[in-house]
Structure formats: C-alpha cells, structure tokens
C-alpha cells in the first residue's frame, strides 16, 4: 500500500478497510483479516493496524468477538456512508462552492454537467 503524507497511516488503513467493506469484499457480519494478517498485507507494523481497528470499532464499523476476531458490524456500511457524507459536506463542499464562486460557474451549469456525468457513466 502506498501511503500519503497528509494523513496518519492508521487512518489511511482504516479508509482502505472502509472501501473494502463498501465494495462487499467484507460484507456485514463477515470476519475481516486479523491484525497480523492485515499488517502483513499492507506492510506496516501490527501496532498501526491495532490503531486502525480501534478507530473502526469506535465508529461502530467493526466489532471484536474476543478470541475469535474482528467482524463487520451489521450497520457498518451505513456508518461509513454517514461519516463520509459528513466529511464531504463539512470539508469538501465548502471548497467546491468557493471554487464555483471564484470561477463564476452557475448552479445551472453544474446541474447540466452532473446530468451529463450520470448519463455517461451511470446509465450504460
């Protein structure tokens, strides 16, 4: 795994696991790799993956069955989407709106472009 400098490694690993959950690589109720397995997979120290798993547990995305392993929570996907929606609305959307304003792009033009995007990429 290639890591970026602008975010903690444990959070990048947690984001990757969230992506895998959203892609159904790890469906709700299914066991995810052990800490050691995942550490070997992404080539980091096991303590880093421990922090990732702790963060995912705090967000109620995964849970631990003591002595058995970590599992995707039944509502794990919902929690991931809620976290990402909040991050989008609080962090990304204000920057996007600022860019629209400074470039003089109208809401109508965005609406047109969004409709084109949907028809091109999602309505095949």
Question: What label would you give each PLM region?
Answer:
Residues 1-31, 37, 87, 91-123:
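Extreme N-terminal segment that seeds HTH/winged-HTH DNA-binding domains in transcriptional regulators
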Residues 10, 14, 34, 70-86:
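Short, cationic-aromatic polyanion-contact patches
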Residues 25-26, 30, 58-67, 71-74:
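Beta-hairpin "wing" of winged helix-turn-helix
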Residues 41, 58-61, 120:
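Residue cluster at the C-terminal edge of the helix-turn-helix DNA-binding motif
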